[in-house]
Amino acid sequence: MKTLLLTLVVVTILCLDLGYTLTCLTHESLFFETTETCSDGQNLCYAKWFAVFPGARRPDGGCAATCPDKVPLEIVNCCTTDKCNL
């Protein structure tokens, strides 16, 4: 009986989702950041800054499956650890 109970406990632990979930920063505005828990398949955090007008940049960021493409006047950084997209 103890063996059956131990087997059930081990099987339960193995069947649980013990995967790691990445957390990224989202940039709501220039000074306000919140966190976002990434969905399955989104294994990158990105930060994107682009010029609104000369001397001012607007931030964007969050979770992504692939690093976003860079366009002119834009800075894009991607990383793979929690809250790394400052």
Curated annotation (Swiss-Prot):
Keywords: Disulfide bond, G-protein coupled acetylcholine receptor impairing toxin, G-protein coupled receptor impairing toxin, Neurotoxin, Postsynaptic neurotoxin, Secreted, Signal, Toxin. Transmembrane segments: none annotated. Coiled coil: none annotated. One of its GO terms (cellular component) is extracellular region. SUPFAM superfamilies: Snake toxin-like. One of its GO terms (molecular function) is toxin activity. Monomer. Binds to the muscarinic acetylcholine receptor (CHRM). This is Muscarinic toxin MTX6.
